[in-house]
């Protein structure tokens, strides 16, 4: 099982009547004492005005058992906005025919299912997904997976895609994350909500957004930024911040390098990390997830920064510079930005890790939803399968599979060896008549042919791998672009393009 994510508010007593608030979310890696909550008369109640028992700055609440007391509740007061990302050039060729959030994940899912499921599990049922590139498969998936009137007619829930469009007032496409939201502000402001929840469509994590929003309200923030500890190797790829003892962001630097990077080092024991982990992770990085009060969003994008295109590099630092209350919400659970082929590969193979996977799809309390496909159970005939995840509807015959993820409808023939590989599967089954027709033409069916060996690779959907093929990168090539031949190599990982044909006997 994955780490159980908990969250709450650290309260530190002050000599004045006000109190300091440090918002946070923790995994089992954080430790501390409970923050007790009681009703006004001292007795526990289901709905209440909560009083906090003040503890030391290092204390962390065990909010696994704590209540979230949002009033009004999230289904009525929060609008979820998921940013579909840009062209996804670093994930190419997986984004050749699909938007980044539509990339398959974990055998049965797509990336977009992660933020949408987090929203639904957090009682947020009004969700827009903004996209600009290759949105056909994303539209299709969302319409099939998440029906209209999500959450019942009372809540009037929905998951809708908003594609970039031109208008007489604005002939330009989306210029960045903030510009994408600005172009649809006219639609977002029609919703009678208190906050906008801004999310990314290409992250893998599990978070209770209700606790995130509650922390935003309790700290009386204009903007709350989800943040997590980060090591120096990856820090240059993120926006980094410094916070004061109240959890307020006092300095923000987008993707700093050199001396600017060194200047952003902080003592992350304030997040609840022990000394050893704090030394390994001396930075606080933005996760690209924000809660922004509605009136603040309208003011920032229309009046204060009408030319700003990006939240991370322009709007958030700008809001800090003009004195707005920008708070940090500290998170220490599993989180992965799936922006590159290597990160995508590692995130998928991470679900096979034992004894505890990096991310679990088996969490009963926070399930990940997806499109119901009504496929039959997978069939394994004399197969040797170790440390792997197998999707629905697969047919696997007398082969060996080790430390791999096998996507839905995958067909793997006799004698094949699959190691350290992600197979995305297929969109449809081929009939025996189809296979005879292909054989007569000298082609091969969808799936993995007899006696083929695939190691450390990603095989996209509907790929046709012939017999006796070896995809093992024996020369350890790190980068190669062979699109006409049906594959790319990035970071040493061979990626077979969607619908590609790899003839029998090929060695890659």
UniProtKB/Swiss-Prot annotation:
Transit peptide residues are 1-59
Q: Where is this region: Disordered?
A: 1-27
Q: State the GO CC annotations.
A: chloroplast
Q: In which tissues is it expressed?
A: Seeds.
Spell out the reaction equation it catalyses: alpha-D-glucose 1-phosphate + ATP + H(+) = ADP-alpha-D-glucose + diphosphate
Organism domain of life = Eukaryota
Activity regulation comment:
Activated by 3'phosphoglycerate, inhibited by orthophosphate. Allosteric regulation.
Does this entry carry the keyword Transferase?
Answer: yes
Q: What is the E.C. number? A: 2.7.7.27
List keywords of the entry alphabetically.
Answer: Allosteric enzyme, ATP-binding, Chloroplast, Nucleotide-binding, Nucleotidyltransferase, Plastid, Starch biosynthesis, Transferase, Transit peptide
What is the protein's major site of localization? plastid
One Pfam family of this protein, by short name?
NTP_transferase
Quote the pathway field. Answer: Glycan biosynthesis; starch biosynthesis
Specify residue ranges for compositional bias: Low complexity.
15-27
Molecular function (GO) terms for this protein are: ATP binding; glucose-1-phosphate adenylyltransferase activity
Q: Name one GO biological process term.
A: glycogen biosynthetic process
Q: Where in the cell is it found?
A: Plastid, Chloroplast
SUBUNIT field: Heterotetramer.
Q: What does this protein do?
A: This protein plays a role in synthesis of starch. It catalyzes the synthesis of the activated glycosyl donor, ADP-glucose from Glc-1-P and ATP.
To which protein family does this belong?
Belongs to the bacterial/plant glucose-1-phosphate adenylyltransferase family.
Name of the protein this chain belongs to: Glucose-1-phosphate adenylyltransferase small subunit 1, chloroplastic
What species does this protein belong to? Vicia faba (Broad bean)
